[in-house]
Amino acid sequence: MENIGRQRPIGVFDSGIGGLTNVRALMERLPMENIIYFGDTARVPYGTKSKATIENFSMQIVDFLLGHDVKAMVIACNTIAAVAGRKIRQKTGNMPVLDVISAGAKAALATTRNNKIGIIATNTTVNSNAYARAIHRDNPDTLVRTQAAPLLVPLVEEGWLEHEVTRLTVCEYLKPLLADGIDTLVLGCTHFPLLKPLIGREAHNVALVDSAITTAEETARVLAQEGLLDTGNNNPDYRFYVSDIPLKFRTIGERFLGRTMEQIEMVSLG
């Protein structure tokens, strides 16, 4: 019975497809784990919606994943983590629930040497102040500078990862953060890890914190601690569920995932 518990999947969810960067990191860090992903592509973006609506949509996704008997959940969406994280944890009880903000904040504090941390994220995540709160809970003396970088999302989805337009946009967003002397930068949006090489060149003396990688590390640590790591599965099952299959979804999704998406299924929630 214990082994069956370990074989249960990890549930990962996002408001769209950006969370596939988290799935990619989990596949690389935990190659024997079964994974179920849900992206609410019919109702993205969440950032423009009210707190009550975001909580309602999130609860529907959590119910869906609980119906698939997941052993842990990863909130692979900064907006959901900032707005509905507490409510999700109340609903799931003792189940391990990881999120990109908590993991990113923890990694940033472990990385910085001068106690000056920058965050680039979407408008909603910046306005929520969730990263600063998470960092200041552990170290109130840390300087946290946030910068909304909304234009990077469509550029990533367009595939312009090394385009001059993207480079210039990154430079503009980095200017105020670099002027404040940050030595650590959190990539606070699930799209941004794809721009890590470009951002690294433009902020070459700054350590980059990839929330997807740090969340995968934290997931591995918690599963091991709870005795839930699957160590005997050489043929893991990956399932991808979405609420809509928009134009170019597979192309963009596979760019985020770094491999082909074989099992995509559309489901309707709510």
From Swiss-Prot:
PROSITE patterns associated with the record:
ASP_GLU_RACEMASE_2
The protein's annotated catalytic reaction(s) are: L-glutamate = D-glutamate
Catalytic residues, per the record, are 77 (proton donor/acceptor), 189 (proton donor/acceptor)
* Positions that bind substrate: 14-15, 46-47, 78-79, 190-191
Which Pfam family name is an example for this entry? Asp_Glu_race
| Biological processes annotated in GO | cell wall organization; peptidoglycan biosynthetic process; regulation of cell shape
Q: What is its EC number?
A: 5.1.1.3
What this chain does, per the entry, is described as: Provides the (R)-glutamate required for cell wall biosynthesis.
Tell me the protein's name. Answer: Glutamate racemase
* Gene name tied to this protein: murI
